[in-house]
Amino acid sequence: MIHPDVRDVRLETQGMRRPVVGVIGNAYRIENRFATQMVGERNLRAVAEVSGALPLMFAGCPEITDIGALLDTVNGVVLTGARANVHPTHFRTEPHERHEPYDQHRDDVALALSEACVARGIPLFGICRGLQEMNVAFGGSLHPEIRELPGRMNHRMPRLENGEIHPDPTVVFADRHDVNLVPGGAFATLLGCQTIRVNSLHGQGILDPGERVVIEGVAEDGTIEAIRIADAPGFALGVQWHAEYDPQRNPINRALFQAFGEALLASKGRA
């Protein structure tokens, strides 16, 4: 059920087909044996319920996903968060087993897709790993353990004393730190404020921004949390936090998915 405070972008699509959004899949093995692709339901619900679009999962596997054909089919793309990290060879760093798992098939799709979306003006929204992929696609680098940099907080998800993930999603996705937005920037304008508070569930983070990557928001400890791609003809924003968490009620995440939905309608109208 859509929260009553959410302005339903789907109302704007009455009498026309809803925009279609490609949501990237992540590699997963059922019982550690059977290869599959999966997407977290929160991502799908955010696209459907707040952006007002039809979510369509596509494989994060270059042997399956033809990027040109995909972009001829969808009106926008969401690069979701994922457990696997971007492989360090994409930004000239040696891999290490403590930073595994990696998903190089998704890397191959997401990096090429980021450039293709921007080149074609197709709305692109990167979340957590998706922000990192956008940065690497445009020549940037990542640090595999942000918490090891001087003065940085631990941005990883909360865990129990035994190391297991906390079972309560309200604890896992609780707002944990502020993000200061660039005055007059895209995010400050979109959200109508200078400071927001967000969740934090990541180990890697941006070290060096890519050539066209514009920093739009920074955490209290200096970690880059929001970006846009300079001179992109369409929506091309990325966030380090998990904006897919409860955008039906969270005003910051809701505003982002609504803006993405509006960009989809505008892009669809130009098609």
What does each model-identified segment do?
Residues 233-235:
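A short, structured beta-strand/loop element
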Residues 237-240:
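Active-site-proximal beta-strand elements of phosphoester/diester hydrolases
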Residues 1-125, 135-143, 147-191, 203, ...:
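N-terminal beta1-alpha1 cap of cysteine-dependent amidohydrolase-like domains
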Residues 194-197:
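Catalytic cores of DNA base-excision repair glycosylases
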